């Protein structure tokens, strides 16, 4: 398959970081959350993650082989997709459902659209939504963590947010409550996100704008902003999924618009809809709007003065 050149808005910054190095850093950032999920939900968390990652790598290699493309599983992009997809599953999910999700994420969302760099949406997000729609009962069957507080034993914090107070903040930080693998331990997600920012893998603009928007709207609506920030998939989505290079804007203005949109949609679904969580749908909807955001936030041409009204530019 011939190499394609894609040019986004100038100016352009060159970097010695390869796709492989970037993806490896993302994997490193997710390891603390994986360890936390094993502590909270048991060894099945690790097994489910391993199966999902293996399935993603297999489908990527098999598809490329069948289509006569270069097999580039060593870039770790399929590993990242597999880990993110597993982080969006409960530890009790049957392994074959995880494989179905991996097929949807890698083959349908990523490879059928041209492979890495051409997918219209985050593959793991679409995989999660597809599984939630097709296997709703299994995807909402959250295991009871060890030593969890009664209100959060097997329910997500968002489902019982009205019962939570300041005394439960530590539980939300440590993740000792119901939920999917990668959404419970807020502190490891935050540490992973800070690592990605410190190593310049991601820009802080999208996650900061996203989280700030949710916090402000929570206060305006009379809800506890800390519970909203530490619950559900917000931390995972803000730092690891909304910042995907392919499906997020490249301009700073675009990133701010993107983050604002994510926060507004997430809160609209959480506060006004029938679903407790809205992060996945918010990211998917904003992924679809990225081309329009890019066009309308494109940087002005440098070195050319704007024409004055009634006269030509000098």
Segments predicted by a language model, with ranges:
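C-terminal ends of transmembrane helices
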Residues: 58-70, 106-117, 189-199, 239-248
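Loop-to-transmembrane alpha-helix initiation sites
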Residues: 120, 124, 227-234, 254-258, ...
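Alpha-helical transmembrane segments in multi-pass membrane proteins
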Residues: 25-33, 48-60, 77-82, 86, ...
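Structural signature of hydrophobic alpha-helical transmembrane segments
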Residues: 42-55, 92-101, 172, 176-184, ...
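Membrane-interface helix-loop-helix junctions at boundaries between adjacent transmembrane segments
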Residues: 74-78, 83-150
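Long hydrophobic alpha-helical segments that form multi-pass transmembrane helix bundles
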Residues: 117-190
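Generic transmembrane alpha-helix motif of multi-pass integral membrane proteins
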Residues: 33-36, 81-90, 104, 189-196, ...
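N-terminal signal-anchor module of multipass membrane proteins
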Residues: 1-53, 57, 306-314
């Amino acid at each position: 398959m011939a190499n394609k050149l894609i040019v986004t808005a100038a100016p352009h910054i060159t970097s010695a970081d390869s796709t492989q190095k970037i993806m490896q850093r993302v994997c490193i950032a997710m390891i603390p959350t994986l360890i936390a999920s094993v502590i909270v939900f048991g060894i099945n968390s690790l097994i489910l993650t391993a199966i999902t990652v293996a399935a993603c790598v297999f489908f990527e290699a098999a598809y490329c082989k069948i289509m006569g493309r270069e097999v580039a599983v060593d870039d770790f992009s399929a590993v990242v997709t597999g880990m993110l997809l597993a982080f969006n599953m409960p530890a009790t999910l049957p392994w074959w459902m995880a494989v179905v999700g991996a097929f949807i994420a890698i083959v349908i969302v990523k490879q059928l659209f041209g492979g890495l760099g051409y997918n219209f949406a985050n593959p793991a997000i679409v995989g999660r939504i597809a599984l939630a729609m097709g296997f709703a009962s299994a995807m909402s069957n959250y295991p009871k963590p060890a030593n969890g507080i009664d209100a959060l034993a097997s329910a997500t914090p968002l489902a019982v947010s009205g019962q939570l107070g300041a005394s439960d903040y530590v539980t939300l930080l440590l993740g000792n409550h119901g939920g999917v693998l990668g959404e419970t331990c807020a502190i490891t997600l935050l540490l992973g996100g800070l690592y990605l920012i410190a190593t310049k893998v991601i820009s802080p603009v999208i996650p900061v704008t996203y989280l700030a928007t949710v916090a402000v709207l929570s206060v305006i609506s009379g809800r506890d902003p800390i519970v909203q920030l530490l619950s559900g998939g917000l931390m995972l989505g803000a730092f690891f999924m909304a910042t995907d290079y392919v499906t997020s804007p490249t301009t700073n203005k675009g990133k701010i618009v993107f983050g604002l949109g994510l926060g507004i949609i997430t809160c609209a679904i959480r506060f006004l809809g029938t679903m407790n969580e809205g992060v996945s749908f918010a990211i998917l909807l904003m992924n679809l709007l990225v081309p329009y955001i890019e066009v309308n936030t494109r940087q002005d041409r440098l070195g050319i003065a704007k024409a004055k009204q009634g006269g030509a530019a000098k």
